[in-house]
Amino acid sequence: MRFRQVHLDFHTSEHIEDIGKKFDKKQFQTALKTGHINSITLFSKCHHGWAYHPSKANEIHPHLDFDLLGAQIQAAHEIGVKTPIYLSAGLDEKMAHRHPEWLVRNLDESTTWAKDFTEPGYHKMCMSSPYLDYLVKQIEEVCKNYDADGIFLDIAGVQPCYCQNCIAEREELGLNPYDENDVLKHAETVYKRYAEKTRAAVDKYKPNLPLFHNGGHIRQGRRDLVNYNTHLELESLPTGGWGYDHFPFSARYCQGLGVDYLGMTGKFHGSWGEFGGFKHPNALRFEVALAAANGAKCSVGDQLSPSGEMDMVTYDLIGSAYSELEEKEEWLDNVESVADIAIISPEAYVGDLSTGQMTKV
């Protein structure tokens, strides 16, 4: 896994026009070189549900008229930059409106993340619904048609759900559809099925391609869940809600798992999607150095403008940190922790925990 990565978010509403109109291969390559970047995660599908390439398994964004993903991959590969591909797994707002019966439901029938359709926000999809097969076809398509260096599936985790699909399946399995323990037991089954089907979808065309399921946190004490990933990406933006103590503790846990991992921060002053926000260069230098000091590779989150033009101020900022990391890489790879003090994780001892229950920790 490469040291100097960027996670290039591109969640773009169908109400925005002229998508990708200012994309320019040379400008894209210049930004990557300026940022000292050697891997960039690019979008096949965003939280709004749109594809950024011609698609039979999905629908291309209504205001995009060319293969943006393909153009980005070609530009990156020309200069030796790897291109993992991102698909939003747990969120698909287009299908949330077309198939509300595919949504995760709470006990009171409300949805999550947004509680209903009168509240602005995304609505989480249930992997026990036909949505899973819809997602699998999208993964197969992108693995078949594009030279991906990995697959990143977002908003994935064990999710208790009271939708009618889940209730019916629990009854078929002889479980109590409303008992909290049985609901969680079933949620584990649903996640396992999702993980196995998505892995099979990748392997159908790209056997052994790196695959990561992101839930915003690596659950401590659940090594079985780690095994569904080829590597780990520790999403942890200090100013974005995770805090400055989250990453070191999470990285310390990952040091004992025997898998490659990276620390994912962001260029934002606050959190994801903040086009006009830039953290101080010294803050990013610190976060990149912190990742390296904890045995991790690094990824910096950015949000591409709907126009497709890379923001050079952002890549100057990233370059100020990654140029320093690049000088040290030969001493940072294949390292082992020399810590001789164990850390007890409260999370590993509080019992069952799901992505829908994170606030209990």
Label each PLM-derived region with a short phrase.
Residues 1-21:
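Boundary/entry segment of secreted carbohydrate-active catalytic domains
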Residues 33-68, 91-118, 160, 167-170, ...:
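Aromatic-lined carbohydrate-binding/catalytic grooves of carbohydrate-active enzymes
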Residues 85, 89-146, 184, 195-197:
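Active-site-adjacent "subsite" loops/lids of carbohydrate-active enzymes
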